[in-house]
Amino acid sequence: MTRFVGLMVLALVAAACSNSTEPQHLRFEARTSVSQSTAITVQTEVTVINDGPTTTQIEVSTCPRAIEGFTTPERTGAPLWRIYGGEVCDAAARIRMLGPGDYYVYHFGTRQIPANLPIGNYYLAVDMGYQLVPAGQFSTF
């Protein structure tokens, strides 16, 4: 029983820290499709891949992740905008185990970019909690 309680406490501590510490050996790749018809909309997905030799855990709750827009390719400083989806956050920690070589894909619904952007290049990123993941770019004319 003591061993089980110890493992449970460890799991809870790891879950509580999952948004503030970067898991080891995880690689993030993002893809975004941009539609520029009447309004600029984006659809983004982020794949997290375990490149390490051991199983690790990631948080996969329903809480929305922000898609952020920057004016520099480095994506540093405060973003011009931050768009959250309409997902309902139930505040329940959901953990998924990723073995070596395993991956998980986060799908984000369609998000509308602010309409009043000046002409220029914009660089997208997704705030994954662990890190800011570059997610493509687009230009306005």
Annotated model-derived regions:
Residues 13-16:
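C-terminal motif of bacterial Sec signal peptides marking the signal peptidase cleavage site
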